[in-house]
């Protein structure tokens, strides 16, 4: 999902970020709000949507088939969804999900109607018989209704009903935090992905419908058009999408130097933007090549890659990325931020997926860090450091990067899963001090967890394994604690006093200081330590662009050390 940063502030910093030959000559202040950010109250509605109860864990979905008709004039949809699954345990009741404003017309299995009850967004389905473990089964749901409209897509999601400048309907949807059950009946939990899917979308004549995957068939009649899209890879439910509009196909190809396979690039754009898109979308191939080099092969080669011109800024729908940035490059015409960021999600978020929205930094933090890595690849390390400085400005420290689990929480006003998540990786890179090892960790993490749903703890385990060291102290502080570490210090004529604040006793991040032209590595702990100064002023800002921590003068340290 596109990062929520004020464009005016970006422009203000533009010349500093891009043209500077060195790191910024200021120490960026770190904030630790006294009051932590709140989470939503755990209502029954949240519990039913977010938790993997026995009514969900009892079955594993392997295929979804959506057959949906979109009626733009009424902002109305109707259709049938067939969920094919395999039983994990014996059961006779399961839970699927559909927002309560959407009407269920029929619910069947094996051509027999099923009894069901609805509570909030949950639908509890009583099967006609006990389903045995390992048995395959399917249920069919016919439904209709007016889905929720997005207030601020893609962050505050739902359907987007707009018209292009020629007056044609132009429709999209984004539902990462709200869930797929906003518009189609599904097992709406991030820890279960179908192995494949088919999406059939019917729209009024003269309009086209685009979804994920490959276009299998088009049925054109005098009044309606139906488009059949097939997804041949696992896909998380919120990524299943549709776009409706008067689109024109822009075809291209990408030849991988990693796999030596050719991926089809089938972009769908509004006809009056075709010539702009033809030039502008060439940059896609540069980004795919860069990410393949860093993290391995593009994950969805059979399904291709496409940008679809959308009536909102952007969203990382798998193999069908929403694009709404107006064909503008950012940062002195170097790259289109939306394309760069959303394409990164094909590796981070779509290939490697968080099993719970609380671990969304694996999507957004990694994708935001990819932006900085791309800047480094085209402009060098100093530009990379300056880009990281820009991200650091927005860190809020109101909540831990890994949020509270089982509540499906996402707040677009709090950018820390983006920018602090990115800084976790940046700080880890500095702390490991071995770029070859660091990037091997990232690539291994992606390749070992391709098409899997994971938690932050899986990344911690891999870092510990690859480095041969225990980095639990690092991740406990930067992922699971809210506050940033602060280095308290003061100096007398001949002594520097220092210690960590807002950390546990096992936090052992080394830092560098400069005394004249000499660099000294300190190993602070929560206990006060000293270093001889010889009347020279210490510079703590030497690696403030390499590590995330704050500094604070505490003149009481010389007195306090006597009482340790």
Q: Each predicted region: which residue ranges?
A:
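Hydrophobic helix-coil surface modules that form long, contiguous segments used
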Residues: 79, 175-176, 187-340, 369
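Beta-strand-rich binding/interaction modules
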Residues: 103-110, 471-472, 491-545
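A surface-exposed beta-strand-loop module
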Residues: 31-32, 99-162, 533-534
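Acidic/His/Gly-enriched intrinsically disordered linker/tail segments
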Residues: 364-424, 431, 449
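N-terminal, polar/Ser/Thr-rich
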Residues: 21-78, 82, 162-168, 472
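Zinc-dependent metallopeptidase catalytic helix centered on the HExxH motif
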Residues: 285, 322-385
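Extended, low-hydrophobicity, Ser/Thr/Pro/Gly-biased non-transmembrane segments
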Residues: 36-45, 55, 142-251, 540-549, ...
């Amino acid at each position: 999902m596109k990062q929520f940063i004020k464009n005016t502030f970006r422009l203000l910093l533009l010349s500093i970020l891009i043209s500077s030959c060195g790191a910024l000559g200021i120490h960026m202040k770190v904030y630790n709000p006294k009051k932590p950010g709140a989470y939503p109250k755990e209502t029954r509605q949240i519990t039913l949507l977010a938790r993997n109860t026995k009514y969900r864990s009892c079955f594993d979905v392997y295929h979804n088939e959506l057959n949906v008709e979109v009626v733009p004039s009424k902002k109305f949809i109707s259709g049938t969804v067939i969920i094919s699954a395999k039983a994990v345990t014996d059961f006779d009741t399961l839970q699927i999900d559909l927002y309560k404003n959407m009407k269920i017309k029929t619910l069947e299995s094996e051509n027999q109607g099923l009894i069901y009850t609805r509570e909030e967004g949950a639908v509890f389905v009583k099967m006609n018989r006990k389903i045995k473990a390992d048995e395959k089964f399917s249920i069919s749901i016919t439904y209709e209704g007016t889905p929720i409209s997005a207030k601020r897509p893609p962050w505050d999601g739902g359907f987007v009903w707009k018209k292009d400048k020629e007056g044609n309907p132009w429709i999209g949807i984004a539902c990462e935090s709200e869930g797929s059950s906003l518009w189609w009946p599904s097992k709406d939990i991030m820890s279960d992905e179908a192995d494949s899917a088919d999406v059939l979308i019917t729209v009024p004549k003269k309009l086209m419908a685009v979804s994920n995957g490959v276009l299998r068939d088009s049925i054109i009649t005098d009044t309606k058009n139906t488009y059949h899209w097939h997804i041949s890879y696992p896909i998380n439910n919120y990524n299943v999408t549709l776009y409706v509009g008067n689109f024109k196909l822009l075809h291209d190809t990408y030849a991988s130097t990693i796999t030596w396979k050719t991926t089809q690039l089938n972009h769908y754009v509004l006809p009056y933007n075709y010539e702009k898109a033809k030039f502008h979308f060439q940059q896609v191939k540069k980004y795919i090549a860069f990410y393949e080099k860093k993290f391995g092969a593009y994950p969805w080669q059979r399904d291709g890659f496409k940008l679809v011109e959308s009536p909102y800024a952007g969203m990382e729908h798998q193999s069908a990325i929403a694009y709404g940035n107006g064909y503008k490059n950012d940062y002195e015409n170097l790259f289109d931020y939306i394309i760069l960021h959303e394409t990164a999600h094909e590796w981070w978020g779509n290939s490697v997926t968080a099993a719970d929205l609380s671990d969304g930094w694996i999507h957004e933090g990694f994708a935001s860090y990819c932006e900085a890595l791309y800047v480094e690849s085209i402009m060098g390390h100093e530009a990379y450091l300056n880009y990281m400085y820009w991200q650091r400005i927005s860190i809020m420290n109101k909540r831990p990067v890994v949020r509270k689990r089982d509540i499906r929480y996402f707040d677009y006003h709090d950018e820390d899963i983006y920018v602090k998540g990115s800084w976790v990786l940046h700080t880890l890179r500095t702390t490991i001090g071995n770029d070859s090892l660091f990037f091997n960790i990232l690539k291994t993490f992606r390749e070992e967890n391709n098409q899997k749903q994971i938690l932050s703890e899986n990344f911690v385990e891999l870092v510990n394994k690859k480095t041969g060291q225990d980095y639990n102290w690092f991740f406990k502080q930067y992922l699971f604690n809210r506050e940033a570490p602060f280095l308290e210090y003061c100096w007398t004529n001949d002594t520097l006093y220092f210690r960590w604040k807002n950390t546990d006793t096992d936090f052992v991040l080394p830092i560098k200081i400069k005394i004249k032209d000499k660099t000294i590595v300190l190993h602070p702990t929560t206990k006060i330590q000293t270093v001889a100064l010889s009347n020279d002023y210490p510079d703590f800002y030497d690696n403030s662009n390499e590590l995330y921590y704050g500094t604070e003068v505490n003149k009481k340290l010389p007195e306090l050390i006597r009482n340790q």
